[in-house]
Swiss-Prot record:
Gene3D superfamilies: 1.20.1530.20, 3.30.465.10, Regulator of K+ conductance, C-terminal domain (3.30.70.1450). SUPFAM superfamilies: FAD-binding/transporter-associated domain-like (SSF56176), TrkA C-terminal domain-like (SSF116726). This is K(+)/H(+) antiporter NhaP2. The lineage of its organism: Bacteria, Pseudomonadati, Pseudomonadota, Gammaproteobacteria, Pseudomonadales. The chain crosses the membrane at residues 6-26, 34-54, 57-77, 86-106, 108-128, 162-182, 193-213, 217-237, 240-260, 269-289, 292-312, 334-354, 366-386. It comes from Pseudomonas fluorescens (strain SBW25).
Length: 580
C-alpha cells in the first residue's frame, strides 16, 4: 500500500463521515432515524452507487465489534443503577426467554419462506433475534418515555447479545458438523457466557474506577484510559469465552454509578466516540451490502420482517413480561413495538460467511433487509406510537447547561445555569424569598450582558440567567424554581386536576373528596396505597383507577412516591384541599 492509496483512503473516509454527519441533520425534519441515513450514505457510496467495492468481511467484523464495545461502554456509563429497581429482572427475562421465543418463531417462518431446513431457519432467527444497543440508545434518547419502559429497553439491549451470539455460534457449529440434536452442555455454555461476562465486567469496572481515582494524569487522558480499559475488559472476556458485550456494558455501569474523577470529561469524550463508532459501523455495513442482491429476496424478506415485528416480538414480550404485574398493557405493547434491530444482526450474519456455510450470503442479505425494515418502520414511528400508547411523561425541567466543578478527586459538585421564563412564579421575587434546596447556592446572576452580584434583595426579572452550585439530586427541586415550564401546560393536563402529597393519609383524602374506603386502612399513606395498586416498583407516570378517579404518580422521592396527581370525572371536580 503506497502513500497515494493511504491518502485516498483518508480522503474517502473523511468525506463519508462528513457526509453522514451533514445529512443526519435532515433526520428530525424527515422523521427518519439517523442510523438509517448513515446506512443509506454507505449504500449510496458502495458498489451500486459511488462504485466503492468493499467485501472484506473480517474487517467489517472487527469494526463492528470495536464500535459496539465503545457504544455499550458509553451506554453503561449513562445507565443509572436506580433504574434496575423497576427493570432489571423484566429486562433479563426479555434478554433470555424473549430472544429464545423470537428466534424460534422467526426461524420457523424463515425455513418455510426460503425452503431451508429447520436448523438453517433457526440460524436466521438467532442472527436477528436480539435488539441492538446502538439503535436503542440512539432512538430512545430525549423521547420522554417513562422510566419503566426506557430502563427495560436499554437494559435488555445491553444484555441480550450473549444469548444471540450463543445461539448463532451453536447453530453454526451444528450446521458445520452435521449435528441435528441439542445437548445439555449447551446450557452450561450459555451460563458460562453470562457468568464470565458478569464477573469480569463488574470486576474490571471496579478496578478501572480505582485506577482513575488514584492516578494523577492530565485531564484529557482519563477518558482515553476509560476507553482503553473498557476495550481491555471486552477482549479479556472474549478470550475467556464469556460475553464481551455484557462485560463492557457492566464495566461502564460500575464506573458511571460511582464518584469518579473527571466525570464530565469522560462522558463528553465517550459521547463523541460513541457517535463516531455508530457512524463508522453503519457506514462500513452500508458499504458491505450489494443493494441489487436484495431485490430478488425483497418480498419474502419483507414478509419475514413483518412476521417478526408484528407476531414474534410481541409474543416474546408478552411471555417474557408475564410474571411482572407492574407492566401495563400499553407498556408491553410499546416494548413489543420497539424491538429495534441494528448493527448486531448484521455483524452476526458475518459469522456464517466467515465459516463458509451454504446460504451464508442469503443469511447476510436477510439480516440487512430486516434491519433496514426495522429501523424504517419501528424507528420512524417510535414518537407517534409512544404518544398513542401513552407511555410518555412530561420531561423533567432541566438547566440550559451544566458543568462539573473538580473541587476534589471524586467531587460531584456541578454548576447549573437556568434561564428564567416569564411564566415562572419567582419572577419579581427577591432571592431571599426562594426556598433553595439544602446544599445549593446561587453563585452568579447575569442580566443581559451584565454580571450582577446577587444579594438577598436582588429581584429576579424575565430573561435572567442564574448560576447555581449543587448536586445532580438537586435538579428536580431546582427545576421547579427556575426552569421553563413545559409548553401548553403539559404537566397539568397529564397529572390531573390537583397534586397531593404522597404522605397524605387515605382517611383525610377520602373525607375531603367524598371517596369510599371500603375496608382500606384510613391511616395508610396515599403513596403506599398507590404502590400496592401498581403491583411493583412505581415510576413517574404510573396511573391507577380508584373510586372512578385517576391517580397518577407525579414525583418520585428515591424509591418512594413523593406526589400523586388526581383527576376527577368531568363535572364532578371538587374544590381544592390538600393540593400544592
Amino acid at each position: 500500500m503506497n502513500a497515494t492509496t493511504i491518502n485516498s483512503l483518508f480522503l474517502i473516509g473523511a468525506l463519508l463521515v462528513s457526509a453522514s454527519i451533514l445529512v443526519s441533520s435532515l433526520s428530525s425534519r424527515l422523521g427518519i432515524p439517523i442510523l438509517v441515513i448513515i446506512l443509506a450514505v454507505g449504500m449510496v457510496a458502495g458498489v451500486d452507487g459511488g462504485g466503492i467495492i468493499f467485501d472484506n468481511y473480517p474487517t467489517a467484523y472487527l469494526v463492528g465489534n470495536l464500535a459496539l464495545a465503545v457504544i455499550l461502554l458509553d451506554g453503561g456509563l449513562r445507565t443509572r443503577v436506580a433504574s434496575f429497581r423497576v427493570a432489571l429482572w423484566p429486562a433479563l427475562s426479555l434478554a433470555t426467554v424473549g430472544v429464545l421465543i423470537t428466534t424460534g418463531l422467526t426461524g420457523m417462518a424463515a425455513a418455510w419462506l426460503f425452503d431451508l431446513n429447520i436448523i438453517q431457519g433457526l440460524l436466521i432467527g438467532a442472527i436477528v433475534g436480539s435488539t441492538d444497543a446502538a439503535a436503542v440508545f440512539s432512538l430512545l434518547g430525549g423521547k420522554g418515555l417513562n422510566e419503566r419502559v426506557t430502563a427495560s429497553l436499554e437494559i435488555e439491549s445491553g444484555s441480550n447479545d450473549p444469548m444471540a451470539v450463543f445461539l448463532t455460534v451453536t447453530l453454526i457449529d451444528m450446521l458445520a458438523s452435521g449435528q441435528t440434536g441439542l445437548h445439555w452442555s449447551l446450557l452450561t455454555h450459555l451460563v458460562r457466557e453470562f457468568g464470565i461476562g458478569g464477573v469480569v465486567g463488574l470486576g474490571g469496572g471496579w478496578l478501572m474506577l480505582q485506577m482513575v481515582n488514584r492516578i494523577n494524569l492530565a485531564t484529557g487522558l482519563y477518558p482515553i484510559l476509560v476507553i482503553a480499559g473498557g476495550l481491555f475488559v471486552f477482549a479479556v472476556t472474549n478470550a475467556l469465552h464469556g460475553s464481551g458485550f455484557l462485560a463492557v456494558y457492566l464495566c461502564g455501569l460500575v464506573i458511571g454509578n460511582r464518584p469518579v474523577r473527571s466525570r464530565h470529561g469522560i462522558l463528553h469524550m465517550l459521547d463523541g466516540m460513541a457517535w463516531l463508532a455508530q457512524i463508522g459501523m453503519f457506514l462500513v455495513l452500508g458499504l458491505l451490502v450489494t443493494p441489487h442482491d436484495l431485490l430478488p429476496i425483497a418480498l419474502p424478506a419483507l414478509g419475514l420482517a413483518l412476521w417478526m415485528i408484528l407476531f414474534a416480538r410481541p409474543l416474546s414480550v408478552m411471555v417474557g413480561l408475564l410474571p411482572f404485574k407492574a407492566f401495563h398493557g400499553r407498556e408491553k405493547a410499546f416494548i413489543a413495538w420497539v424491538g429495534l434491530r441494528g448493527a448486531v444482526p448484521i455483524i452476526l450474519a458475518v459469522f456464517p460467511l466467515m465459516a463458509g456455510l451454504p446460504h451464508a450470503q442469503l443469511y447476510f442479505n436477510l439480516a440487512f433487509f430486516i434491519v433496514l425494515v426495522s429501523l424504517l418502520v419501528q424507528g420512524t414511528s417510535l414518537p407517534w406510537v409512544a404518544k398513542l400508547l401513552k407511555v410518555t411523561v412530561p420531561p423533567d425541567p432541566a438547566p440550559i447547561s451544566r458543568a462539573a466543578l473538580e473541587v476534589h478527586v471524586t467531587s460531584e459538585w456541578e454548576l447549573f445555569v437556568y434561564r428564567l421564563g416569564a411564566e415562572k412564579w419567582c419572577i419579581g421575587a427577591a432571592l431571599r424569598e426562594l426556598k433553595m434546596p439544602e446544599g445549593t447556592r446561587i453563585a452568579a446572576l447575569f442580566r443581559g450582558q451584565q454580571l450582577l452580584h446577587p444579594s438577598g434583595s436582588t429581584v429576579l426579572e424575565v430573561g435572567d440567567l442564574l448560576c447555581v452550585i449543587g448536586h445532580e439530586h438537586n435538579l428536580p427541586a431546582l427545576g421547579k424554581l427556575f426552569s421553563q415550564a413545559p409548553q401548553r401546560g403539559l404537566d397539568l393536563r397529564f397529572f390531573g386536576d390537583f397534586v397531593l402529597e404522597g404522605d397524605a393519609q387515605l382517611g383525610a383524602v377520602s373525607a375531603l373528596y367524598g371517596l369510599k374506603l371500603e375496608g382500606i386502612d384510613p391511616d395508610m399513606p396515599l403513596s403506599r396505597f398507590i404502590t400496592q395498586k401498581v403491583g411493583g416498583a412505581p415510576v413517574v407516570g404510573d396511573q391507577v383507577e380508584w373510586n372512578n378517579t385517576i391517580w397518577t404518580v407525579a414525583v418520585m422521592d428515591g424509591n418512594k412516591i413523593g406526589k400523586v396527581g388526581v383527576r376527577f370525572p368531568e363535572g364532578s371536580r371538587p374544590g381544592p384541599g390538600l393540593f400544592l
